[in-house]
Structures are given as C-alpha cells and as structure tokens.
Amino acid sequence: MTIGLSVTNDVFARDILTVAQLNQAVGQLLERSIPSLWVRGEISNFTQAASGHWYFTLKDSRAAVRTVMFRSRAAQVGFVPRPGDQVEVRARVSLYEPRGDYQLQADGMRRAGVGNLYEAFLRLKAQLQDEGLFDPQRKRQPARLPRAIGVVTSLHAAALRDVLSALARRAPQVPVIIYPAPVQGADAAARLAARVAQANQRAEVDTLLLVRGGGSIEDLWSFNDEALAREVAASDIPVISGVGHETDFTIVDFVADLRAPTPTAAAELACVPRGDLLAALRHTAEWLARAQQRRLDQAAQRLDRAAAMLTSPAQRLAHQQERLNTLRHRLASAWRGPQGHRVARLDMLAQRLAHRRPDTGRAAERSAALLAQLGRAQARLAAARQARLDTLAAQLRALDPQHTLARGYAIVRDAAGAIVTDATRLAARDRIEIAVARGRIGADVTDIGTPDGTDGNPALRRG
C-alpha cells in the first residue's frame, strides 16, 4: 500500500519542538494520512477493563501492535476474544501521545476467515435462488393436524428440550419422533441430510422440524451446506427450520417450507393448541345441530302447506253424497209427472251425476306418493347429518389422550404427580406411577438409562 503524507501544519518548520508538540503533530499526521483498514493477527495480552474497554496486542510472527477497542464498539462484536484467537480488526492508526506509542483504535472485529465464509454464503444463496429453490410457490404449509411430528437435531442440544416442552404444552396428543444427528462439526451437515432423507423414507411424520440453538457463524455453518439445503428442498415432508436466534439466517432457512426465529417458535408453528381444536369442534357440532333442526323445521312447514292444498277424498265423497241425496229428493218429487218425463229426467240426472263423481282412487294414490316422497327426503337429510356427526365424533375421539394410550403409549408421573419427560429427574428407588390405556401401574425406579453420547442412535419415540 502506498500512503501519501500531507502535513498542512507548519509545526515541523519550527527550530525546536517540545515532546508534546512532536507527538501531537505525528498523531495528526497518522490520523489524516492513513484511512480505516482491516488488519489480521493473533490476540495476546487481552484485558477487559472495568470500564468495558478492551486492551490487547495484535501480532503475527514478525511484529506486534497495541490495540484499543472502546466499550461502545466492543459491545457490538458478539463474542469476547481470547489470547491465541485469530481475528480481523477494522481500525484507524493513532498515536497515544503521553507515551509516544502508535496504536490501533479498533471499531470492528470478526473471527479470521469469517469474511470468506460470508462470501461463500452469498455465492451459494445466489446460486440456489437462481435455481428457484427459494420460490414461495414451491413451499407448502405444514399439516394443521399432524398425526406425528419429527425433530432433526442433536440429542444433547438445549433446542431439543425447548421443542419437546413446547409440543407437550400445546399438543400433548401428537407423537414426536426424534431423528438424532450432530448439529456442528466436520460431518454434521452430512448426518443432518441423512436424517432428513431417513424421515422421508419412513414417511411416519407429517411435519419435520430442523432445529438447533444459537452460536457463531462457524457454529451454524453446517446449516449453510449445499447438500443439506438440497435435501431439505427435495423433502416430501414440509420442513420448518428453527436455527439459532431471530437475527441468524442460514441457507436452510431459505429453502425450508417455513422459517421460525427460534426452535421453540418452530414447535409452536408445527401444531395447533389442543384447546383451540376442541373449541372449534364444539362450535362446529353446535352449528351442525342448529342447521339440521332448521332443515327439519322447514321440511315440516312444507309438509303442512302441501297437506293444506290437498283436498281430502273423504270430504269430496261427503259432498257428492249430499248432492246425490238432493237429486233423489227432487226425483221423488217429480215422479208424479208423466212416466216418460220422469224416466228422461232421471237419465239426465244420472248422466250429470256420473260426470261429477270424483276419482277418489287416483286422488288417494297421489296423496300417498307425495307422503312417501317427503318421507324419503327426510330420511336422506337425517342420514347425511348423522354421517357428518359421526365423522366429527371420530375426529374428537382421535384427539382424546386416552385414544393415544390405547395405541401403546404410556404416561409416567413421579411421586408429586408431575409428568416425567427426562429420566435424569429420577433417582433409584423413586416411586413412579405409569398410566396405560386400561389402568395405572405403581412401580419403583431400579435403573435409569442416559444417552451414551452417540448421535447415530436409532430414532427415539415419545408418545
């Protein structure tokens, strides 16, 4: 680097300078002539003062320089360096005038190599985005009512405890299947990708959570792996990522179907609270009952209107009988006339009566057909409503914890009645109670198993 020196002050034109004048002039010269720059080196002699300022030496194999980082800048670094750490410091060159020592005044710091990692992150992000792997249209919404939820993470991760706690609180009826894999290290990305593929092969869960807690960019780097990102993008099971904290973003977050800011938030996105589901089912059942009653009332009203419009055959026969009696009376009165006149008159009346006689048989058949049609309509409506109620009842029974126990799961409580989710909370000879589908079992703890530290164990189940 070529640095042009330009001194506007005529202090150096004096014959004699004091030490203070010299140091002040040199300090101004350094600050005006050398721009802010990045310097790579090893941390040594690190001290964090009570004021919050950092004082350390930045060195390599051939030289060293004193460095200061004031509290406001140090608070933005995100980690506290230790002696021996390789770092990259953004600083300005200055002079500590009381001693005449030149030093670096740092206003930024990152671990050495982070710049290269970030550049690799941006290249892979741009490549996968160009391929359409970030396209919102290819992403799917997780199942609203999952039959089981899978979790891909380390068995020893705090994130796993957070996820299991959130799921037990919100949806205790949903089984959780853990696919254990390391979340950092040389082979972590490959192991995580293998677990995602295994979950798809088994097809035993409806939603997959890929989670880990926070950390540095190096700690989270496994989740920026291209092979893992492509495995997540190709998953037939919707994937929710919950990696790091809210401000952390990885490549997996961009290809996942849904991104959560934390592992706990990922668990909350994966299921609807059980209380909300039961309330919705009750509301739906009440609505269906009211709707069915309205349909039945409307059908009854239509039946009443149809009955009112249909003249009773008995009434028509009675009317015709009355008419016939009247004609007979008139015939008897007219019998006293000439015989021929009476016979002709009688024939005429008989013909008129024949024309006015109601077809009672046809009217009765039509009435019976209408009643049968109305009965069939009511039966179909009642059958449809009963089938819908049966379906809702089956869904409600599926949410019952007793139904889950009937499938072979069990609930373990300690002596205080609290549900046991962590074996390490118990000790030998502790009294426990095991609830199964039909009854409860009292037992004493004789042995406690703990994880052996190997992340390649078969998938564990929690019912």
UniProtKB/Swiss-Prot annotation:
<keyword id="KW-0540">Nuclease</keyword>
<dbReference type="GO" id="GO:0005737">
    <property type="term" value="C:cytoplasm"/>
</dbReference>
<comment type="function">
    <text>Bidirectionally degrades single-stranded DNA into large acid-insoluble oligonucleotides, which are then degraded further into small acid-soluble oligonucleotides.</text>
</comment>
<dbReference type="InterPro" id="IPR003753">
    <property type="entry name" value="Exonuc_VII_L"/>
</dbReference>
<dbReference type="GO" id="GO:0006308">
    <property type="term" value="P:DNA catabolic process"/>
</dbReference>
<dbReference type="Pfam" id="PF02601">
    <property type="entry name" value="Exonuc_VII_L"/>
</dbReference>
<dbReference type="GO" id="GO:0009318">
    <property type="term" value="C:exodeoxyribonuclease VII complex"/>
</dbReference>
<comment type="subunit">
    <text>Heterooligomer composed of large and small subunits.</text>
</comment>
<dbReference type="Pfam" id="PF13742">
    <property type="entry name" value="tRNA_anti_2"/>
</dbReference>
<keyword id="KW-0269">Exonuclease</keyword>
<dbReference type="GO" id="GO:0008855">
    <property type="term" value="F:exodeoxyribonuclease VII activity"/>
</dbReference>
<dbReference type="GO" id="GO:0003676">
    <property type="term" value="F:nucleic acid binding"/>
</dbReference>
<keyword id="KW-0378">Hydrolase</keyword>
<keyword id="KW-0963">Cytoplasm</keyword>
<protein>
    <recommendedName>
        <fullName>Exodeoxyribonuclease 7 large subunit</fullName>
        <ecNumber>3.1.11.6</ecNumber>
    </recommendedName>
</protein>
<dbReference type="InterPro" id="IPR020579">
    <property type="entry name" value="Exonuc_VII_lsu_C"/>
</dbReference>
<comment type="similarity">
    <text>Belongs to the XseA family.</text>
</comment>
<dbReference type="InterPro" id="IPR025824">
    <property type="entry name" value="OB-fold_nuc-bd_dom"/>
</dbReference>
